[in-house]
Amino acid sequence: MTLNAESEALVGVSHPLDPLSRVEIARAVAILKEGPAAAESFRFISVELREPSKDDLRAGVAVAREADAVLVDRAQARSFEAVVDLEAGTVDSWKLLAENIQPPFMLDEFAECEDACRKDPEVIAALAKRGLTNLDLVCFEPWSVGYFGEDNEGRRLMRALVFVRDEADDSPYAHPIENFIVFYDLNAGKVVRLEDDQAIPVPSARGNYLPKYVGEARTDLKPLNITQPEGASFTVTGNHVTWADWSFRVGFTPREGLVLHQLKFKDQGVDRPVINRASLSEMVVPYGDTAPVQAKKNAFDSGEYNIGNMANSLTLGCDCLGEIKYFDGHSVDSHGNPWTIENAICMHEEDDSILWKHFDFREGTAETRRSRKLVISFIATVANYEYAFYWHLFLDGSIEFLVKATGILSTAGQLPGEKNPYGQSLNNDGLYAPIHQHMFNVRMDFELDGVKNAVYEVDMEYPEHNPTGTAFMAVDRLLETEQKAIRKTNEAKHRFWKIANHESKNLVNEPVAYRLIPTNGIQLAARDDAYVSKRAQFARNNLWVTAYDRTERFAAGEYPNQATGADDGLHIWTQKDRNIVDTDLVVWYTFGMHHVVRLEDWPVMPRQNIGFMLEPHGFFNQNPTLNLPTSTSTTQTGEADTCCHNGK
């Protein structure tokens, strides 16, 4: 079968990398339900675009629209992968996954778990013994169970942490029910275990941030309006964006959220490729507390929860300011119904202070140019935390990836007056929040002036001949194989890494390059023999470089949910020790936040910035922003006022 003209119009596909539309998702589900997934027991984990091969895209050949689907058959308690040809109407591949593989959770499975816990007789009775009888105020928060050496016998499990509210709008995180965990089997559809250990008094002090609890808002801050009277400087055609010298395509997947494709920079009229594909690959949040419940908190928010599905519908004026372009995100619920996250991705421009300036004191003249950046973002809510993910593109060719962490701490209970060395007391009523980390990995499929790239490590070194003691230099070392490219940051050596193209030379006959500035380059704090370290080995180092393989997509492997970490992921792929010199390669950078909790993080956390920079390093022959015009501002009378020129 092929899509008819009416369906094609609904699909709205203009490029092979465009995400699947709702029509295409519905079609893929229908094809699967008419075929191998006909049974009512099947649940859909994800249906997304099967991206064409890079060779086909470069060649410009016609490619079929295909969908990758992941499903679970609850009756068999087994998982499957499928490839669907949307134009032919066929299932081209149907693969039974290994018995121990558990795909990510779906959003409606979280609601299913909470509802089942609230109705379970054993749970109700156990809570009643703790004096909690109004189940409408009890909140069950499903987490992944992780892996701690146990045999879960192929069961697809969630573990629910439990909190309680004083009233409907009260923050439940102020009132954790400690040492009380409910295990729910999604395939069996029932509670299978209850861990009800030492009861600790539920903290009663509130921790609310809603206006009705906080009181009147301050009135001394005057309006700060963002105006662009001539509109935004970007042009959008479908999912293709051009802005200043940048061009790229916007993508969205249930697993990664925002994806950037075919990132190019126009230099002297030529579109030069920089990165073929860039996205969040994985993240893990391990907790450092030894308390029984807290010690098993280590969520892989991308690989276990499909963080793209948790994207917010963004609101003008609150999440993004200025002239905004939104992109919707399409996904599927567990029953195969397409659904849309409206305004899942936000794109806008921001002023970014000065870009360059010089005052010629001899002539008494100054030249200043202001910077601006293009911001492409999405924000995901993962239970208590919010993660805002940003790609920033700058006029000088720089790129920034930034995570802004906010939301509410994951809290725990202790006896009033206790001081837990593994966390911060938030009040004197027994509430604390454990120390933890937020570890992120970003995958960047570089294509710097072409496919054949290489990576250098650059360290500061002192020469042997150094009579004044002031000499130091930057020394490049080529990373030749995957094993040699497993690296850690080193601030003492001012280390950074360069991605270069030996076949493309700049003005001084050096390979063109970009450099990765490894800010926030922390590593996993857990011991190497800890289960979370074995599962999140990507977080034990900061830099990984692999030879391109389209099947190697996620740093902790394709399916980290309940996985041991022994079979998949960067640490497995790099054992091949493939050549990474003058070849198609992928750069993976791990960074994070070591979150030592403070009182100011409660009851809602001021955002914390975590990220890194990519900067051109000999990619251009000179500063590429010399052609920027002098800037103007608008006065209160509405007249243009030149704010960046001589004599002002």
UniProtKB/Swiss-Prot annotation:
One of its GO terms (biological process) is amine metabolic process. Mn(2+) binds at D445, F446, D584. It catalyses: a primary methyl amine + O2 + H2O = an aldehyde + H2O2 + NH4(+). Topaquinone (TPQ) is generated by copper-dependent autoxidation of a specific tyrosyl residue. Its cofactor is Cu cation; Zn(2+); L-topaquinone; Mn(2+). Belongs to the copper/topaquinone oxidase family. NCBIfam families: PRK11504.1. This is Primary amine oxidase.
